């Protein structure tokens, strides 16, 4: 059976799905184009204009009723969707429309699933002379405080984000914690930040040249300090999850006091006390 070359040249639709925290709503984002093989003839574009747009539809999983929030055409395109509660989300309009740049794309909105209570909660601005746009993203929801979420934003420092507690209805933010600043901003790689149940950062993982370093955060002093340092390819451990009571880590086989038991390529799973640096 012969397949025409067009089949191998088509870029099919790639929808994305996101379920609300309580499992009631399914959000579907997809390109507002027919799912057919339509090869863009303009080689500079590469793909059809519609491939850069995203529509947004909600399905109530209890009733299976659907509601189109945006058909995704032109300036109505959706970008940067995130849930902030069971029935509220944030998004940013798409970057372009048929006439050019969509200036609404520089604004982040919060809105209910039914379209009510839409509020501007953030604006993208160029940091003077620093060549970076301000941005905001949700990093944690607070189960004990559903009216607030933890967001990361670089509004204070262009190239490094701090953590804020934000009201999901008003967009009002309160600085919660200072983000980690690497020694070598261009050379060091900073991985994800581990946070406690209140949203405060606990630790972060950083690659510094041939070393991997775990830094911990003191919310009283708002300082980051080196907790432990490992040399590349040497025995080490990495946090998987962290709470105020301890960390779940994976890594080489250590004794409770931290002495290496066995040098091999397999990993063990431990509970780790960062205060005493003991394994259990």
Predicted feature locations:
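Beta-propeller folds
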Residues: 1-280
């Amino acid at each position: 059976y012969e397949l025409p070359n067009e089949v191998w040249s088509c870029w099919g639709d790639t929808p994305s799905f996101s379920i609300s925290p309580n499992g009631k709503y399914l959000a579907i984002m997809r390109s507002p184009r027919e799912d057919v093989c339509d090869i863009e003839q303009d080689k500079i574009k590469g793909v059809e204009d519609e491939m850069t747009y995203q529509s947004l539809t909600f399905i109530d999983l209890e009733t299976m009723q659907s509601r189109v929030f945006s058909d995704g055409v032109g300036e109505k395109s959706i970008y940067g969707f995130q849930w902030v509660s069971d029935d509220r989300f944030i998004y940013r309009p798409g970057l372009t429309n048929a006439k050019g740049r969509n200036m609404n794309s520089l604004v982040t909105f919060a809105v209910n699933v039914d379209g009510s209570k839409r509020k501007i909660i953030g604006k993208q601005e160029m940091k003077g002379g620093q060549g970076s746009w301000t941005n905001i993203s949700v990093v944690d929801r607070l189960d004990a405080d559903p009216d607030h979420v933890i967001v990361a934003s670089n509004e204070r420092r262009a190239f490094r984000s701090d953590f804020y507690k934000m009201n999901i209805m008003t967009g009002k933010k309160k600085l919660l914690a200072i983000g980690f600043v690497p020694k070598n901003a261009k050379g060091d790689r900073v991985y994800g930040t581990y946070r406690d149940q209140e949203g405060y950062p606990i630790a972060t993982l950083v690659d510094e040249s041939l070393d991997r370093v775990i830094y911990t955060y003191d919310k009283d002093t708002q300082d980051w300090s080196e907790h432990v340092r490992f040399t590349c390819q040497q025995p080490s451990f990495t946090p998987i999850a962290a709470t105020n009571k301890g960390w779940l880590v994976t890594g080489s086989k250590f004794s409770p006091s931290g002495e290496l038991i066995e040098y091999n390529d397999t990993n063990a799973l431990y509970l780790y006390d960062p205060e005493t640096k003991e394994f259990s």
